[in-house]
Regions:
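C-terminal binding/interaction regions
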Residues: 3, 7, 12-43, 51-52, ...
């Protein structure tokens, strides 16, 4: 089945590409069939990395539908735990993530997607973080021993203005 066939299947039916059943450790670890292991909440962790710079951009979760759509459309889709809904990256901001490669770990319970980015519709540089930084990992934990750790900014400037990009959209960060 070609990528175009898979894409057409996704766009014309609600059936996902066939994920194999997990039948043996050997099949999962050494086989060539995709048999992802979703957790008890129906999600799998996903690390998103820039395809060219190798920079870690973000961490999110995918449910089965998000993984199916990501594979089929080559655009990153995630499951938003805070909003409890499917989330196509860039739907609000215009900052889509175009998938170049998808990796899965040895026991098929964690995904890495390598992406290229687009710039926000409202202007600014390419980024992945809703706070405005290029990466969601824009701070480093510093301190040692018995000291209370501090957070040190490793990205000094925001890539875009989140107010201009998101407007009145509710902030997904929860306390």
């Amino acid at each position: 089945m070609t990528r175009r066939d898979i894409f057409n299947q996704i766009m014309t039916t609600n059936r996902p590409p066939i994920f194999s059943d997990r039948t043996s450790v050997e099949q999962v670890e050494e086989g060539t069939q995709l048999a992802p292991k979703f957790d008890d909440k129906g999600v799998i962790p996903c690390i998103t990395q820039h395809a060219e710079t190798r920079e870690i951009l973000m961490f999110a979760f995918m449910n089965e539908e998000a993984l199916r759509l990501t594979i089929g459309t080559r655009l990153a889709h995630y499951w938003s735990r805070s909003r409890q809904k499917l989330w196509k990256k860039g739907e609000t901001s215009g900052m889509t993530q175009e998938v170049q490669r998808i990796l899965i770990d040895d026991d098929q319970d964690c995904i890495i997607i390598e992406v290229t980015l687009t710039t926000p519709d409202a202007g600014g540089d390419e980024a992945s973080c809703h706070v405005g930084y290029r990466s969601c990992f824009y701070r480093e934990i510093s301190g040692s021993g018995d000291d209370l750790p501090d957070l040190k900014f490793i990205e000094s400037e925001k890539a875009f203005d989140p107010n201009a990009v998101y407007g009145d959209t509710p902030n997904p960060t929860q306390l």
